[in-house]
């Protein structure tokens, strides 16, 4: 055993003083002093349980003692009689065994591979032990779940990630997926339950038993987000549902995650074999699949962006050359060739590395370096986490913990440890880049083109100076460019830029100026880019991004030249610069039906319990997607209808995620309303009105929302802090509003307007579906029925969605007096015009003026309300373009008129989109769009002016 270093020997005195009476420096073995000096977690544990220290002193932990964990836990649970005592025993058992593992690891009594095995087996033992106890308890309460033939159904648990691979780290959370085989009902209990309900309740109790903090701590943080559909999907799925999902919808990243999936309990029963056989074809393709490399490259890019976003420095997991890159290297070979090479199908990394070497897929020296780096990094990670039982991969900044790690890694001092770490990570990065990396580099031609601009940047030319590279610019433009450069340099003098930042900036600016100043609009473009540069000069990582990736720099220049809105967004949120790295995604927005899945994958990297990071991640995702939509709009690859479609699908994905976050937080606090115990879903819906309801969102649109529930009276929640069910839904809606409007460093998510709810701002924030129907039928004004034409459910249970759709259809198909309706719609339009009148009389307000967008919307709404009782099909859509289509199809409006109004409508909306990209108000010269305006005004007179 290595003696304690000098700083640790001094700290040891403090440790001894904290121990209970009976423990003195002389009574402690050298081993005990070393472990307790190294790990505050071990020290706190033996202070609370001195008998554990005596146990360790008398008999050291053994390498194979993991084989006894199940038996030891069975003994510990023998006296458990309820969930509370189960939770206590699980927590104490986990802590006792973790102290033993920390002891063995710190003193190197057991090799590092075995430590990973012990940590994984401990987690598996606790999961299986808790599941089995709770399964029996649930069966006593509700009966045994059976298939139609009466065969009992088990709960199968897939351990994902490092747990599945047998490589769990010291303070890891656990990723799980729950499944059961076949549908059916419980038998033999006090009351029958559908199998789905039984297993959902069992799953909820199991998560609580493992995850909920008590006075004894928690067992493991449980993350269920890898299951199909993530948090918005069922907690437990049948085999049939799992198979359907992975065959029809499984994404690449889910395939990679499934490589390490392992059934907890290592059962070899028929159900377990069936589940393994079902999943294998999804994970390992029969053919050699080289598309994996680009997919993994994209995933690595996402992680690199996350490191930049969150400012993760000295991160041995996610940083360049870290643990994640070794995992990616191994997964490349597993996913490309695993279908044909069974030896590559191992869940564990080190055996797979051996297979890669045996198949000669990597040079022997590379494999040896990766193995050494992996074991070095995993030991360092585990030691780091065992200091405080804390889930971290970031190297410490304080002297004590640095001294601890240096000693634990058998280095003379901290600099020596950092040197060894740097060498290992450099070896990993080299192999990773050769296999997966795609770093760009400047061509010799680029360097030659940029060289003359070095003089412009470094010599600080004056306004009246002349230089050949600026000769092509007009005098005024040349003066503006030189002034901008000079002003930017003055601004830099006020900023605390380090030597590395200066070096990167001096490397970047000649390339940037060469690209900007070759343009005719050089002065305008440079004026938009310099504020962005001023904002990132103290964040060297972003300067390096632009310097090292010439393609990203070119896209930055092109987008800033095209749109001041994009330039402003990039300046405000520099993390968006990451989006410029891949032109394939930059100008190709996410598929309209894939926003939810992309967001789900994005949020998986953020701890579920970290509300602040979750809020940031939502905002960052939205901004990145907005940038991609705007880039495609500018490039002309998205027509106006598609721009709005994408903005609307993005908003719906955001609503879905916000409701999920709010729901999770509320249920953790109060439990869920008891009426949901007997059914699937949440009994809650979000209805989108206006531009959201009509699929017509713009870049800066707010969201018009109302909230509905179907909670009966006198229902309470089932949590420890009981509240009235309707109060729960009110607080849920308030929480949703809060999550949307909270301002973080990345801004707000959306402005939300809930005033279209029954009784407006004076009404309840959330309304029961029955009360909503009653209000619409007996109290709502005509303008509220107009608003309903453009309303649809954007989040909600199928049951509530159907209920809302029925109310909407009933209201719109109500027979109305034509003259009265015409008068009321026309008068409402005149009131709006008076209230929102154009302040620029010499300009045409595209939205509000006569012949503008709002007139077209009112014409469509009027005709639906006027004729839907005769033609119910008019109620099908909530967007103006398809409503105009329906009016023509149903013989209400002449087809030529409907097409002409549609063209006018899309033309005007297209102009609004482009004005927004230029950060210009929504009005133009009076001479613009005269043809469209005349056509709309003629249609208005035809339908809405009394005759």
Curated annotation (Swiss-Prot):
Q: Name one GO biological process term.
A: regulation of glutamine family amino acid metabolic process
- Major enzyme class: transferase
What SUPFAM superfamilies does the record point to?
A: Nucleotidyltransferase, Nucleotidyltransferase substrate binding subunit/domain
Task: Spell out the residue ranges making up region: Adenylyl transferase.
Answer: 450-947
Q: Which GO terms describe its cellular component?
A: cytosol
The protein's UniProt keywords, in alphabetical order, are:
ATP-binding, Magnesium, Multifunctional enzyme, Nucleotide-binding, Nucleotidyltransferase, Transferase
Q: Which InterPro entries match?
A: GlnE, GlnE_rpt_dom, NT_sf, PII_UdlTrfase/GS_AdlTrfase
A Gene Ontology MF term for this entry? [glutamine synthetase]-adenylyl-L-tyrosine phosphorylase activity
Q: Which reaction does it catalyse?
A: [glutamine synthetase]-O(4)-(5'-adenylyl)-L-tyrosine + phosphate = [glutamine synthetase]-L-tyrosine + ADP; [glutamine synthetase]-L-tyrosine + ATP = [glutamine synthetase]-O(4)-(5'-adenylyl)-L-tyrosine + diphosphate
EC annotation from Swiss-Prot or TrEMBL: 2.7.7.89, 2.7.7.42
Q: Where is this region: Adenylyl removase?
A: 1-440
Any Pfam family from its record, for instance, is GlnE
Q: Which cofactor does it need?
A: Mg(2+)
Q: Which family does it belong to?
A: Belongs to the GlnE family.
Protein's job: Involved in the regulation of glutamine synthetase GlnA, a key enzyme in the process to assimilate ammonia. When cellular nitrogen levels are high, the C-terminal adenylyl transferase (AT) inactivates GlnA by covalent transfer of an adenylyl group from ATP to specific tyrosine residue of GlnA, thus reducing its activity. Conversely, when nitrogen levels are low, the N-terminal adenylyl removase (AR) activates GlnA by removing the adenylyl group by phosphorolysis, increasing its activity.
Q: Which HAMAP family match?
A: GlnE
Q: What is this protein called?
A: Bifunctional glutamine synthetase adenylyltransferase/adenylyl-removing enzyme
């Amino acid at each position: 055993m290595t003696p304690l270093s000098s700083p640790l020997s001094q700290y040891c005195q403090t440790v001894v003083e904290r121990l209970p009476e009976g423990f003195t420096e002389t009574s402690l073995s050298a081993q005990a002093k070393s472990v307790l000096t190294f790990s505050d977690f071990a020290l706190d544990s033996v202070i609370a349980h001195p008998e554990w220290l005596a146990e360790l002193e008398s008999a050291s932990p053994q390498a194979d003692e993991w084989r006894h964990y199940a038996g030891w836990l069975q003994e510990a649970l023998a006296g458990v009689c309820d969930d509370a005592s189960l939770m206590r025993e699980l927590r104490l058992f986990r802590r006792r065994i973790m102290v033993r593992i920390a002891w063995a690891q710190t003193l190197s009594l057991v090799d590092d591979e075995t430590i990973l095995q012990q940590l994984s087996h401990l987690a598996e033992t606790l999961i299986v032990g808790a599941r089995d106890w709770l399964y029996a308890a649930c069966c006593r309460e509700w009966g045994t779940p059976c298939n139609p033939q009466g065969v009992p159904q088990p709960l199968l648990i897939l351990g994902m990630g490092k747990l599945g691979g047998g490589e769990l780290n010291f303070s890891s959370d656990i990723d799980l997926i729950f499944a059961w085989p076949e549908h059916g009902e419980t038998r033999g209990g006090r009351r029958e339950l559908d199998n789905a309900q039984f297993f959902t309740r069992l799953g909820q109790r199991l998560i609580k038993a493992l995850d909920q903090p008590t006075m004894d701590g928690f067992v493991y943080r449980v993350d269920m987000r890898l299951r199909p559909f993530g948090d918005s999907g069922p907690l437990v799925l049948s085999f049939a549902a799992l198979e359907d999902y992975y065959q029809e919808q499984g994404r690449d990243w889910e395939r990679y995650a499934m490589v390490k999936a392992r059934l907890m309990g290592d059962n070899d029963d028929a159900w377990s074999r069936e589940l393994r056989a079902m999943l294998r074809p999804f994970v390992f393709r029969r053919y050699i699949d080289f598309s994996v490399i680009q997919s993994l490259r994209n995933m690595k890019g996402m992680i690199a962006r996350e490191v930049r976003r969150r400012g993760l420095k000295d991160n041995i997991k996610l940083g360049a050359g870290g643990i994640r890159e070794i995992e990616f290297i191994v997964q490349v070979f597993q996913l490309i060739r695993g279908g044909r090479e069974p030896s590559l199908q191992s869940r564990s990394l080190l055996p797979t590395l051996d297979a890669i070497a045996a198949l000669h897929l990597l040079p022997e020296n590379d494999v040896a370096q990766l193995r050494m780096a992996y074991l070095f990094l995993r030991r360092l990670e585990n030691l780091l986490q065992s200091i405080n039982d804390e889930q971290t991969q970031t190297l410490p900044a304080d002297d004590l913990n640095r001294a601890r790690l240096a000693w634990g890694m058998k280095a003379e001092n901290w600099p020596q440890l950092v040197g060894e770490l740097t060498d290992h990570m450099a070896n990993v990065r080299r192999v990773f880049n050769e296999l997966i990396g795609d770093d760009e580099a400047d061509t010799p031609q680029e360097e030659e083109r940029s060289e003359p601009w070095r003089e412009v940047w470094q010599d600080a030319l004056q306004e009246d100076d002349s230089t050949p590279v600026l000769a092509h610019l007009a005098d005024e433009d040349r003066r503006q460019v030189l002034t901008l450069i000079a002003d930017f340099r003055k601004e830099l003098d006020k900023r605390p830029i380090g030597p590395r930042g200066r070096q990167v900036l001096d490397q970047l600016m000649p390339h940037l100026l060469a690209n900007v100043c070759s343009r005719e609009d050089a002065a305008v473009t440079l004026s938009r880019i310099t504020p962005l540069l001023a904002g990132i000069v103290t964040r060297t990582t972003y300067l390096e991004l632009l310097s090292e990736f010439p393609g990203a720099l070119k896209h930055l220049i092109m987008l800033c030249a095209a749109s001041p809105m994009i330039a402003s967004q990039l300046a405000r949120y520099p993390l968006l610069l990451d989006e410029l790295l891949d032109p394939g995604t930059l100008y190709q927005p996410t598929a309209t039906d894939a926003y939810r899945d992309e967001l789900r994958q994005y949020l998986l990297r953020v701890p579920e319990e970290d509300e602040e990071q979750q809020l940031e991640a939502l905002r960052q995702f939205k901004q990145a997607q907005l940038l991609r939509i705007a880039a495609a709009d500018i490039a002309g690859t998205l027509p106006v209808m598609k721009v709005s479609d994408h903005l609307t699908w993005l908003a719906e994905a955001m609503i879905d995620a916000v409701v999920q976050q709010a729901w999770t937080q509320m249920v953790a606090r109060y439990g869920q309303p008891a009426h949901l115990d007997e059914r699937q879903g949440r009994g809650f819906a979000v209805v989108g009105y206006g531009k959201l309801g009509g699929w017509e969102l713009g870049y800066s649109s707010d969201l018009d929302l109302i909230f509905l529930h179907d909670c009966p009276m006198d229902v309470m929640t089932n949590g420890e802090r009981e509240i009235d069910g309707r109060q729960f839904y009110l607080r849920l809606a308030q929480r949703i509003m809060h999550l949307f409007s909270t301002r973080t460093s990345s801004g707000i998510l959306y402005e939300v307007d809930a005033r279209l709810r029954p009784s407006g701002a004076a009404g309840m924030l959330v309304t029961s579906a029955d009360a909503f129907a009653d209000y619409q039928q007996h109290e709502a004004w005509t303008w509220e029925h107009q608003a309903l034409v453009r309303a649809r459910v954007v989040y909600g249970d199928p049951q509530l969605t159907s209920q809302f759709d029925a109310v909407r259809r009933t209201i719109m198909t109500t027979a109305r007096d034509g003259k009265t309706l015409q008068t009321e719609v026309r008068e409402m339009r005149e009131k709006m015009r008076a209230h929102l009148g154009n302040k620029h009389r010499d300009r045409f307000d595209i939205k509000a003026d006569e012949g503008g967008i709002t007139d077209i919307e009112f014409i469509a709404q009027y005709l639906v309300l006027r004729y839907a009782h005769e033609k119910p099909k008019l109620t099908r859509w909530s967007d103006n373009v398809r409503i105009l289509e329906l009016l023509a199809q149903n013989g209400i409006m002449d087809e030529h008129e409907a097409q002409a109004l549609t063209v006018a409508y899309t033309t005007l909306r297209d102009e609004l989109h482009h004005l927004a990209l230029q950060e210009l108000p929504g009005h133009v010269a009076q001479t613009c769009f005269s043809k469209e305006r005349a056509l709309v005004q003629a249609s208005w007179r035809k339908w809405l002016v009394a005759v």
